[in-house]
């Protein structure tokens, strides 16, 4: 029940955001209510997604899940859940600020407005990243002691990528606060890559006593892969065409 609600609530959240935009000037109250509703729905979706991801890594909790097959089991009582959830939400705010700056970097505005908007987006990114550092440390300290030790030097690969992510993330925060847009983008991409690998390392640690990747049998399905690539390329072509048409209309309207 709770899980399947993600899909309709995501659709409703998109509708609410459109209402917020369309009614921003004509009906400020409705616009604010729509924005608040969209935020609540998105927070709920994040809550369910984080609960599901946590459940995936904790086979010892699966018995409770199988006892409630209707989708009413929420794996949110684990000690890592709250910092994990906040880690997810705060990082979304940070990337949102960076996306805001990226949009205005390419938007045709006056130089003053464009630079001010980029600076504002970078400040949002920097502040959210500062909070993310605190939340990340909290999350790390809630992990089992053996996992912490692996990230603190016992596992060289895990330690290397965690350290790389922390250094690049801190660097991105500093460059964002000082208004260095392109450097911030590059450091953020490096941070994301390092943290994705770190996340994978943590998942392996959780599942190590229950499952090993080396136990899997590899059965390549080249036909399915080829079909996926064809559809991917076709989709990118369609999206590229849509963007081209949209930008051409915008330029004609501006002219």
Which residues are covered by each model-predicted region?
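Polytopic transmembrane helical bundles with strong interfacial aromatic enrichment
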Residues: 1-255
């Amino acid at each position: 029940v709770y899980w399947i609600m993600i899909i309709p609530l995501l659709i409703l959240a998109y509708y609410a955001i459109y209402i917020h935009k369309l009614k921003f000037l004509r009906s400020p109250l409705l616009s604010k209510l729509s924005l608040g509703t969209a935020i609540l729905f998105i927070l709920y979706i994040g809550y369910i997604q984080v609960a599901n991801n946590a459940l995936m890594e904790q086979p010892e909790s699966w018995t409770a899940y199988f006892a409630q097959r209707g989708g009413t089991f929420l794996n949110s009582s684990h000690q890592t859940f709250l910092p994990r959830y906040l880690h997810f939400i705060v990082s979304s705010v940070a990337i949102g600020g960076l996306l805001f700056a990226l949009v205005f970097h390419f938007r045709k505005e006056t130089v003053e407005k464009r630079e001010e908007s980029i600076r504002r987006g970078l400040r949002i990114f920097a502040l959210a990243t500062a909070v993310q550092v605190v939340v990340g440390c909290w999350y790390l300290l809630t992990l089992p002691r053996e996992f912490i030790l692996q990230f603190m030097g016992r596992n060289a690969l895990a330690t290397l990528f965690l350290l790389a992510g922390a250094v690049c993330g801190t660097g991105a925060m500093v460059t964002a606060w000082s208004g260095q847009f392109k450097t911030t983008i590059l450091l953020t991409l490096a941070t994301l890559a390092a943290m994705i690998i770190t996340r994978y390392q943590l998942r392996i640690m959780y599942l190590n006593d229950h499952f090993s990747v080396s136990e899997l049998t590899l059965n390549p399905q080249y036909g399915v892969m080829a079909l996926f690539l064809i559809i991917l390329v076709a989709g990118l072509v369609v999206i590229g065409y849509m963007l081209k048409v949209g930008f051409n209309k915008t330029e004609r309207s501006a002219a």
